[in-house]
């Protein structure tokens, strides 16, 4: 960021604090950015949808912001990018990524509230954004790899497994983050293509959780286990993995369809005000790619540029629904609203027929 761009974010925050509103009531007018500062965000998102699938923006003045300030500023930035998605059982739109004593590979476990190293995975939005407020004492290194490179390597080593990865017989746990009218697990291939755009979605932890927690879910075949094992061998390879140390004031943005990400375990500081802390936004964006039709079961919509993604959770409010509709209109994005593609009853029929 240039000094001019930083000043734009600072002035917008000053305005937002002088005219305070709940986050879900805010529009761009409540966080007014000058053109030079808007362009930073627009260029970053454009970069995620291009060749690299990722972007790192450095220099946000987080040391001058309180935690509450950063939440307002970060949400304000998102208003220029897309439509924020709910991220957990509590239906929160900004997640605090820090060690809150959670466990990772357990029923209902999520990675963002632990200090554990994470499996390579994709988040449930067109773009996942992390803004670093504080770093760990040691560890927490961010790792990113191309899912296109992953597919190409599978094609070299085990081309017979590509059709397995692209099949729709994969079941994954929602980890208790679904709406009450949704089944507790969903189907989604691990790889696919639509309109010339490749996409991947893999998170072995959630695939295994569906096997562990739901006896009615069809058991993984030998070929499916082989495919998962092969991915686990390829993904951490230094040949394919880009490593970065996120610093205070860094914003990392990732395209969830063409990148996978992870981080190493970390050791935190003792004092609460020194512990590792990042904030996470999940964003549906107007320039997103099309998805294969069967991916709509999880994503809610497979159309390019449509509002989709997120996990519904159990605490959706009318305020969020109004925000979602208003922000979709501002961004020019089609929005179907929430209606499960597959209901609990329909899923029972699906698994009984597999």
Which positions does each model-derived feature cover?
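Active-site environment of non-heme Fe oxygenases that use a 2-His-1-carboxylate facial triad
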Residues: 1-38, 42-43, 50, 55, ...
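Catalytic palm subdomain of template-directed nucleic-acid polymerases
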Residues: 67
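Classical protein tyrosine phosphatase
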Residues: 71
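A short alpha->loop->secondary-structure connector
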Residues: 74-84
């Amino acid at each position: 960021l240039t000094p001019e761009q930083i000043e734009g974010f600072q002035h917008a925050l000053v305005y937002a604090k002088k005219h305070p509103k709940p986050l879900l009531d805010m529009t761009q007018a409540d966080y007014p950015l000058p053109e030079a500062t808007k362009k930073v965000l627009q260029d970053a998102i454009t970069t995620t949808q291009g060749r690299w699938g990722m972007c790192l923006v450095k220099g946000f003045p987080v040391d001058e912001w309180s935690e509450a300030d950063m939440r307002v500023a970060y949400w304000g930035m998102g208003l220029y990018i897309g439509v924020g998605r709910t991220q957990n059982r509590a239906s929160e739109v900004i997640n605090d990524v820090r060690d809150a004593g959670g466990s990772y590979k357990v029923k209902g476990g999520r990675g963002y509230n632990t200090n554990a190293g994470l499996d390579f995975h994709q988040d449930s939005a067109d773009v996942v954004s992390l803004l670093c407020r504080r770093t760990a004492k040691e560890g927490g290194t961010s790792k990113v790899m191309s899912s296109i490179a992953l597919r190409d390597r599978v094609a070299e080593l085990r081309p017979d497994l590509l059709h397995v990865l692209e099949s729709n017989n994969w079941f994954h746990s929602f980890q208790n983050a679904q709406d009450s009218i949704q089944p507790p697990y969903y189907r989604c291939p691990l790889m696919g293509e639509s309109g010339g755009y490749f996409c991947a979605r893999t998170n072995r932890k959630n695939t295994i959780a569906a096997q562990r927690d739901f006896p009615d879910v069809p058991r993984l075949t030998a070929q499916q286990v082989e495919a998962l094992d092969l991915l686990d061998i390829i993904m951490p390879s230094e040949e394919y993995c880009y490593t970065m140390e996120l610093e205070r004031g860094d914003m990392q943005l990732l395209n969830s369809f063409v990148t996978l990400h992870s981080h190493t375990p970390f050791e935190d500081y003792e004092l609460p005000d020194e512990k590792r802390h990042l904030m996470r936004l999940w964003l549906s964006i107007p320039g997103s790619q099309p998805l294969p039709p069967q991916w709509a079961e999880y994503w809610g919509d497979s159309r390019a540029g449509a509002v989709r993604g997120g996990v519904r959770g159990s605490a959706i409010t009318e305020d969020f629904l109004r925000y979602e509709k208003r922000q979709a209109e501002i961004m020019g994005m089609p929005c179907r609203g929430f209606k499960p593609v597959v209901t609990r009853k329909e899923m029972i029929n699906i698994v009984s027929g597999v």
